[in-house]
Amino acid sequence: MSGRGKQGGKARAKAKSRSSRAGLQFPVGRVHRLLRKGNYAERVGAGAPVYLAAVLEYLTAEILELAGNAARDNKKTRIIPRHLQLAIRNDEELNKLLGKVTIAQGGVLPNIQAVLLPKKTDSHKAKAK
């Protein structure tokens, strides 16, 4: 009985997400939806969400790498906002990118002005002799 349904056709291939096609962890489909709903442009090309998801993934990985190093330096196994703050503010490019951003519970960078430090004198050496 030809012409009745899809009995003779090929089995449909397993669905593959656009993120996995691009080799990304960030959701390309969600980024595409947000670009469309955000009224940034009338139309959104197919490559734009892939590129944007890749950029966001790269920036996230970079920040997490530096924050992980900051956590390890402080002998901690969990990244907290303080580690994110230290990572971003100690990196010149990330600090410029996120210069106006306030990180809650981030604290400040340790910094003592040179004028306030005690003066280095030879008084200790003179008293020893």
Curated annotation (Swiss-Prot):
Keywords of the record: Acetylation, Chromosome, DNA-binding, Hydroxylation, Isopeptide bond, Methylation, Nucleosome core, Nucleus, Phosphoprotein, Ubl conjugation
Disulfides per UniProt = none
Q: Which stretches does the entry tag as region Disordered? A: 1-22
Tell where it localizes.
Answer: Nucleus; Chromosome
Where does the record place the modification N6-glutaryllysine?
Answer: 96, 100, 119-120
One of the record's GO molecular function terms = protein heterodimerization activity
Q: Which family does it belong to?
A: Belongs to the histone H2A family.
Q: What is the name attached to this protein's record?
A: Histone H2A-IV
Which organism's genome codes for this protein?
Gallus gallus (Chicken)
